[in-house]
Swiss-Prot record:
Keyword Ion transport: no
Residues that coordinate or bind a 1,2-diacyl-sn-glycero-3-phospho-(1D-myo-inositol): T58, K60, E85, N89, T96, K194
Record carries keyword Acetylation: yes
Listed PANTHER family: PHOSPHATIDYLINOSITOL TRANSFER PROTEIN (PTHR10658), PHOSPHATIDYLINOSITOL TRANSFER PROTEIN ALPHA ISOFORM (PTHR10658:SF28)
GO molecular function, one term: phosphatidylcholine transfer activity
Disordered: annotated segments: 250-270
Family according to the record: Belongs to the PtdIns transfer protein family. PI transfer class I subfamily.
Species of origin: Oryctolagus cuniculus
Residues the record lists as N6-acetyllysine modifications: K215
Annotated protein name in UniProt: Phosphatidylinositol transfer protein alpha isoform
Subcellular localization: Cytoplasm; Nucleus
Task performed by this protein: Catalyzes the transfer of phosphatidylinositol (PI) and phosphatidylcholine (PC) between membranes. Shows a preference for PI and PC containing shorter saturated or monosaturated acyl chains at the sn-1 and sn-2 positions. Preference order for PC is C16:1 > C16:0 > C18:1 > C18:0 > C20:4 and for PI is C16:1 > C16:0 > C18:1 > C18:0 > C20:4 > C20:3.
Length: 270
């Protein structure tokens, strides 16, 4: 049994802009989560081509420890709290698979994302079987809704309801910003349709952990996309060549930060 949910994140950026913004924000967010032996380690970041699909392949290890709930830390042996993330970014479609060497086929998080130039109105963009799709819970994430943010995650400088882009004039986002987008001819919009599959087979813990993982994914998607929009002026002028150079530098910085910096970033909400 697996737990399937689709998260829809609407943003006041274009699909093309998001490609750069996402990669910039992933690099920056990785630095915010790395230190004290924990965080992100980039093993591979290279172009790929397979079965007519072309894009960028990445393989990362997330060293978690304090970022998992206490009940898992108590049960899991040392080294079992590292997860491997393999991602195939054939933008505007991306596929990410997260596994754990200790749990092998009993643990899986799969995130499949379509980026579409709409306001989250398409049904079943991932073309699931009708019988499967009718059991998928759809969750809308509103990046400007503070009630969707945990108080310990809130930062005023990462609040789309307060941010005003100097370079683009976008923001701040009011309570009805999504409805207003339709009438704003000079402001692009898009939706990230993120289909998340979670499998965790551990007798007595399955439901608890699968629900915890979905809760954390929702938290990550919310915080990440709030940051992405509020960092708009930092990335909107960058090219993909700029991003690749930045990723190289970030890889070096992450290796250094993991060894020298204190633990930081999101911890498990026990």
């Amino acid at each position: 049994m697996v737990l399937l949910k689709e998260y829809r994140v609407i943003l006041p950026v274009s699909v093309d802009e998001y490609q750069v913004g996402q990669l910039y924000s992933v690099a920056e967010a990785s630095k915010n989560e790395t230190g004290g032996g924990e965080g992100v380690e980039v093993l591979v970041n290279e172009p790929y081509e397979k079965d007519g699909e072309r894009g960028q392949y990445t393989h990362k290890i997330y060293h978690l420890q304090s970022k998992v709930p206490t009940f898992v830390r108590m049960l899991a042996p040392e080294g079992a709290l590292n997860i491997h993330e393999k991602a195939w970014n054939a933008y505007p479609y991306c596929r990410t698979v997260i596994t754990n060497e200790y749990m092998k086929e009993d643990f899986l998080i799969k995130i499949e994302t379509w980026h579409k130039p709409d306001l989250g109105t398409q049904e079943n963009v991932h073309k699931l079987e009708p019988e499967t799709w009718k059991h998928v819970e759809v969750i809308y994430i509103d990046i400007a809704d503070r009630s969707q943010v945990l108080s310990k995650d809130y930062k005023a400088e990462e609040d789309p309801a307060k941010f005003k882009s100097i370079k683009t004039g976008r923001g701040p986002l009011g309570p009805n910003w999504k409805q207003e987008l339709v009438n704003q001819k000079d402001c692009p919009y898009m939706c990230a349709y993120k289909l998340v599959t979670v499998k965790f087979k551990w007798w007595g813990l399955q439901n608890k952990v699968e629900n915890f993982i979905h809760k954390q994914e929702r938290r990550l998607f919310t915080n990440f996309h709030r940051q992405l929009f509020c960092w708009l002026d930092k990335w909107v002028d960058l090219t993909m060549d700029d991003i690749r150079r930045m990723e190289e530098e970030t890889k070096r910085q992450l290796d250094e930060m993991r060894q020298k910096d204190p633990v930081k970033g999101m911890t498990a909400d026990d």
